[in-house]
Amino acid sequence: MGITRNLILGLACLAFVSIAKALPHEPELGSARVVFQTSYGDIEFGFYPTVAPKTVDHIFKLVRLGGYNTNHFFRVDKGFVAQVADVASGRSAPMNEEQRKEAEKKIVGEFSDVKHVRGTLSMGRYDDPNSAQSSFSMLLGNAPHLDRQYAVFGKVTKGDETLSKLEEVPTRREGIFVMPTERITILSTYYYDTKMESCEEERSVLKRRLQASFVEVERQRMKCFP
């Protein structure tokens, strides 16, 4: 009886371990966050620097250069993708030389086992696997047929309600693309570091504690040494 029970428990543990190994692990997000302020609301996203380091460096540099300001989502296919246009052709404002130089770079395809699910950020490209430049998609649903074919480099961290609003925009079909009938503009962008925010919060808490301690010391001093 005891042997049978132990055998069953052992098999159950092995099965659990096998399932755990089979389940995909979500990669760790870096501390950088980017916010796209669109005509339909804000979308915040983070990066997977250990999954697609070259892609992350390139996209984040374009953000820091202001490359995505005045760009737009040229494609919105409900339940599939909302795709940002290439910086070189999608902006309504002219580019400076530094922006243009970075936008025209081609990035090697960094394909991984990270799944294409809602909120995933995935690079656009042509047939050449190393032809990605600055266009990328925010997934609006699961798309397993894109797995290991397109480079995943991050995910949306806030603003899913904005993605839902984009899905309700009227669209028209042009060939394989489903495109919005109005321009969905990225009005402006900004970025911040979650580690720095955490440090600022800790400093603020410490400052309040020190101020409270000072008040208490002063109160005791006045009480004991009037």
UniProtKB/Swiss-Prot annotation:
Its EC number is 5.2.1.8. The gene is CYP23. It comes from Arabidopsis thaliana. This is Peptidyl-prolyl cis-trans isomerase CYP23. It is an enzyme of class 5 (isomerase). GO terms for molecular function: peptidyl-prolyl cis-trans isomerase activity. InterPro entries: Cyclophilin-like_dom_sf, Cyclophilin-type_PPIase_dom, CYP23-like. CDD domains: cyclophilin. Coiled coil: none annotated. Residues 1-22 form the signal peptide. Ubiquitous. Lower expression in roots. Residues 34-191 form the PPIase cyclophilin-type domain. It catalyses: [protein]-peptidylproline (omega=180) = [protein]-peptidylproline (omega=0). Belongs to the cyclophilin-type PPIase family.
